[in-house]
Swiss-Prot record:
Region feature Disordered, mapped onto this chain: 57-81
PANTHER family: SNF5 (PTHR10019)
Gene name in the database record: sfh1
Any one Gene Ontology molecular-function term assigned to this protein's record: sequence-specific DNA binding
Classification lineage: Eukaryota, Fungi, Dikarya, Ascomycota, Taphrinomycotina
Protein name: Chromatin structure-remodeling complex subunit sfh1
Source domain of life: Eukaryota
Modified residues (Phosphoserine): 269
């Protein structure tokens, strides 16, 4: 199939029609009309009294032509509508995407691993006062795609420097995986009902979405399915779906950590036995708090809301990274390894644990030089390293987990990234 030689995708993203790349909004902290005190007199220019003696009573102001700012028509979400002007669109030669090509057998073996999804948020400062903001899910047990390859593909699509922004994107993904992994890897018991209540607050351009949700931590319902139904009911665009799903994933991970520590809140019920009761039973306001609310805010308020939420997310990530005490049962893993690999008890005793709590991290100066002894992936392509047959810190996360579970290195990953 023929493909175009040029593309305008990267420049069209900067026109304001999407939430992926947006202009930075300067948030004013004080009013210009307020009195600034005595120090403000230092900025007053000196008066030349000699000009008054020569008869120049008034200075003639010099008018400098101001450059007209381009005005875009925006919708109720604050996004530009209509066809972008030709001055902002410029074509460039399309580059071939460097994918990692694997065989069907390798894909089949990779699909056997359990998927553990972690919410990832990117917030990267770009040139010309632009900002890259994106949210997506990353499989902690991903077997083929690495943060480095993902960053290279994203930079190629957005026409960004891989050396500058590729490193920032990959390091941001690895850091968030390291912080969420201890909580995300803990499996929840099936068949039990664990109801929790949490609030959602998402900033969608100039729209502020607020909602209160009751969720079952053991439910097979995914946040993605919930976000699709919510956006369809409220008439929101497709860009709002990953934002809402990301916010739900964050809340669920936080509540999952509280559930593992036995700190889930109890909901009081003063109802008569046999009558309807629950956190959503409200006869006074008829459940007004349980309905989604959309509000249009200014750009300054939207920026403040995003900053406040980002601070809360950073605080929660620090708490999640300190989560411990719920590592996988090492004896059970050794028993499973003996059953799968037909190993003796003495051989399985030397196997490491597959839990994230037993993994190790590399220093930033070690990552560019480190490579996995089996699949040959770089240290920047894995969020943690593990012990293997050749010693400590010799395997990446994917190879190390397979070795800990089966006692054998995965044959299909041999020299995968050579």
């Amino acid at each position: 199939m023929a493909q175009a030689c040029k593309t305008t995708y990267s420049s069209r993203l900067k026109t304001g029609n999407t939430c992926l790349i947006q202009k930075n909004v300067a948030v004013s902290t004080r009013s210009h009309s307020s009195y600034t005190g005595r120090n403000s007199l230092r900025n007053v220019p000196a008066v030349n009294y000699a000009a008054f003696e020569q008869g120049e009573d008034f200075e003639t102001p010099v008018e400098t032509p101001e450059k007209e700012e381009e005005k875009f028509e925006t919708d109720d979400r604050g996004l530009a509508v209509g066809r972008p002007t030709g001055n902002n669109i410029y074509p460039r030669f399309a580059t071939k995407t460097r994918h990692i090509y694997v065989t069907d057998e390798q894909l089949k073996c990779a699909a056997e691993e359990r998927d553990v999804y972690i919410p990832i948020r990117l917030d990267i400062e770009l040139p010309n006062n632009y900002r890259l903001k994106d949210t997506f899910l990353w499989n902690m047990n991903e077997q083929v795609m690495t943060p480095d390859v993902f960053a290279q593909i994203l930079c190629a699509d957005l026409d960004l420097s891989t050396n500058v922004y590729g490193t920032q994107i990959s390091s941001s993904i690895r850091a968030q995986i390291e912080e969420y992994a201890p909580v995300a890897e803990v499996p929840m018991p099936k068949g039990q009902e664990m109801l929790v209540v949490f609030n959602i607050q998402v900033q969608l351009a100039q729209l502020s979405y607020n909602d209160q949700v009751e969720w079952n931590l053991t439910s097979p319902l995914t946040p993605e399915e919930f976000s699709v139904l919510t956006c369809n009911d409220l008439g929101l665009s497709g860009e709002s779906r990953p934002e809402i799903a990301y916010a739900i994933h964050e809340c669920l991970l936080k509540l999952k950590k509280n559930a593992c520590e036995g700190d889930l809140p109890d909901y009081d019920s003063d109802a008569v036995p046999g009558t309807k009761a629950g956190p959503r039973q409200d006869m006074d306001t008829l459940g007004a708090l349980w309905q989604p609310v959309l509000e249009t805010v200014s750009l300054e308020d939207a920026k403040k809301n995003e900053n406040n939420r980002e601070n809360l997310v950073k605080q929660w990530r620090r708490e999640a990274s300190k989560f411990g005490g719920f590592a996988a049962d090492v004896s059970a893993e050794r028993w499973r390894a003996a059953a799968l690999g037909n190993l003796s008890q003495s051989e399985t005793a030397n196997l490491p644990s597959a839990s994230v709590s037993d993994a190790q991290t590399l220093l930033e100066q070690e990552r560019p030089r480190w490579r996995c002894r089996w699949c040959n992936v770089l240290g920047t392509g894995t969020f943690c390293v593990r012990r293997g047959p050749e010693g400590n810190k010799s395997l990446c996360n994917a190879c190390g987990v397979a070795y800990a579970k089966t006692g054998q290195l995965p044959y299909w990953r041999k020299s995968l990234y050579t």
